[in-house]
UniProtKB/Swiss-Prot annotation:
<feature type="propeptide">
    <location>
        <begin position="1"/>
        <end position="25"/>
    </location>
</feature>
<keyword id="KW-0078">Bacteriocin</keyword>
<feature type="modified residue" description="2,3-didehydrobutyrine">
    <location>
        <position position="35"/>
    </location>
</feature>
<dbReference type="GO" id="GO:0005102">
    <property type="term" value="F:signaling receptor binding"/>
</dbReference>
<keyword id="KW-0425">Lantibiotic</keyword>
<feature type="cross-link" description="Beta-methyllanthionine (Thr-Cys)">
    <location>
        <begin position="33"/>
        <end position="38"/>
    </location>
</feature>
<feature type="disulfide bond">
    <location>
        <begin position="46"/>
        <end position="54"/>
    </location>
</feature>
<keyword id="KW-0929">Antimicrobial</keyword>
<feature type="modified residue" description="2,3-didehydrobutyrine">
    <location>
        <position position="33"/>
    </location>
</feature>
<dbReference type="InterPro" id="IPR007682">
    <property type="entry name" value="Lantibiotic_typ-A_Lactobact"/>
</dbReference>
<keyword id="KW-0883">Thioether bond</keyword>
<keyword id="KW-1015">Disulfide bond</keyword>
<dbReference type="Pfam" id="PF04604">
    <property type="entry name" value="L_biotic_typeA"/>
</dbReference>
<comment type="similarity">
    <text>Belongs to the type A lantibiotic family.</text>
</comment>
<protein>
    <recommendedName>
        <fullName>Lantibiotic macedovicin</fullName>
    </recommendedName>
</protein>
<feature type="cross-link" description="Beta-methyllanthionine (Thr-Cys)">
    <location>
        <begin position="35"/>
        <end position="57"/>
    </location>
</feature>
<keyword id="KW-0044">Antibiotic</keyword>
Length: 58
C-alpha cells in the first residue's frame, strides 16, 4: 500500500493532436503552459453550449 509521500506515475497513450490540445502548443490548452504563440498563459475553461478551452493572450 502506498502512503501519501510516495509518487505515482501514470502513462497514457495519446495522439500528437491530443497532446498539442492538452498543452496548448498549437491552439488552445487545458493546463498552464509556455508556448511559442502565447508564452506564460494560463488557459481557462469557458462555458457555452459545449465546454471548450480558451486561451487569453492579453
Amino acid at each position: 500500500m502506498m502512503n501519501a509521500t510516495e509518487n505515482q506515475i501514470f502513462v497514457e497513450t495519446v495522439s500528437d493532436q491530443e497532446l498539442e490540445m492538452l498543452i496548448g502548443g498549437a491552439d488552445r490548452g487545458w493546463i498552464k503552459t509556455l508556448t511559442k504563440d502565447c508564452p506564460n498563459v494560463i488557459s481557462s475553461i469557458c462555458a457555452g453550449t459545449i465546454i471548450t478551452a480558451c486561451k487569453n493572450c492579453a
